[in-house]
Regions:
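Phosphate-coordinating catalytic segments in nucleotide- and nucleic-acid-processing enzymes
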Residues: 1-10, 60-182
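Pre-Walker A-like glycine/lysine-rich segment at the N-terminus of P-loop NTPase domains
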Residues: 2-58, 67-75
Length: 182
């Protein structure tokens, strides 16, 4: 049994807080029960609430992000199916995707004193931090890679935590929000 299961991770969520995710600047659900009914007009955010909870409960798994965007057909236009980039900007409130953009989902259960928390943030890409730069330059035999703009990108960082458990990953994202499969 994992530490998260022992701490009540598998337990039902009682409260969910969503910040800057899709259509929500800030949204909270309280007093959730075993069965909950989300009611609202078309395009009011019902599916977005379920998606936020899904990403939270996926413990930051990169596949959950890809599956979510795939189910909505959120990919960069003009991309071939075999080389498709997923358009991550749709996950951010107002499609705002720039350095400092961030969304988060937090959940609390009755059985645990710990909060489950997911944060997805965008920062400036620092190519010096990425060791593959030299290898890529040699492989492509490019003398002036900056002139070609190959490294104009953002860093996307995903952090998930629950008590002492932590999971994180990062990936390069194009300036337009294109995410290749992590």
């Amino acid at each position: 049994m994992s530490a998260s299961a022992a701490c009540g991770f598998a337990a039902m969520l009682k409260t969910v807080k969503i910040k800057n995710f899709r259509s929500f600047r800030q949204f909270e659900l309280h007093d959730l029960g075993r069965i909950n009914l989300l009611v609202g007009a078309n395009n009011s955010g019902k599916t977005s609430v379920l998606e936020a909870i899904h990403l939270l409960r996926a413990q930051g798994n990169p596949r959950a992000f890809i599956d979510l965007m795939k189910s909505r057909g959120e990919y960069m236009s003009g991309e071939s199916k075999s080389n498709r980039e997923w358009n991550i900007r749709h996950l951010f409130h107002g499609h705002s995707f720039d350095v400092g953009s961030e969304f988060s989902v937090t959940g609390a259960t009755q059985k645990s004193k710990h909060l489950e928390h997911l944060t997805v943030s965008v920062s400036t890409h620092d190519p010096i931090r990425h060791t593959f730069r030299e290898d890529l330059s040699r492989r492509l035999e490019i003398e002036n890679e900056d002139r070609l703009g190959l490294f104009e990108a953002y860093d996307l960082k995903v952090d998930w935590s629950f008590g002492k458990e932590h999971n994180s990953w990062g990936n390069l994202v194009s300036l337009q929000g294109g995410l290749s499969s992590p």
